[in-house]
Amino acid sequence: MKLIIENWNRFLNEEKDISSLDSWEHEDAKSYAKELVEKYGDPDVVTDNMVLWKDNRISEFKKVYVIDESIPHDSPAPHHDYVYSTMEIDVPEDLMEAVAKASESIIVDQLKNEVTARCGDIIANAITLGFVQKLIDGDIKPENSEEEYKKYILEGMTPDWFKEK
């Protein structure tokens, strides 16, 4: 029985070939994942429902991953979220509320000092993470975070560190 369970776990955790993208349910996520593969090469990890690039292979992001999902999101304009980008950013406790008010697509992991942006492309994610950095640096007043975030996204204010192929 133990051998059966070990083999089953090995099967479940086995990495898949990039062709697994063809079976994805959400066309927008599938199309964007394929676009990233074209620009940045094969991902480091491929599963049935996710592709992942890590170790700054895409710009300054610690990791970028696309999940076979399409989450409707209306702020600041209607779109769907499926790509996640993570950076090491330490968000002080007193700025957590300002970050939360700025966007529902900003995910803060205080234990790992990481912030993940989820949107429809890595450009919007770079803008979002750059916004969080500016907020922490004091360049944006916490009480203005929601309005400032919309401005950053709508005006395409990419941070200096963002380099796209």
Residue ranges and their predicted role:
Residues 1-16, 38:
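Charge-dense, intrinsically disordered terminal/linker segments
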Residues 17-165:
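Non-cytosolic coordination micro-motifs
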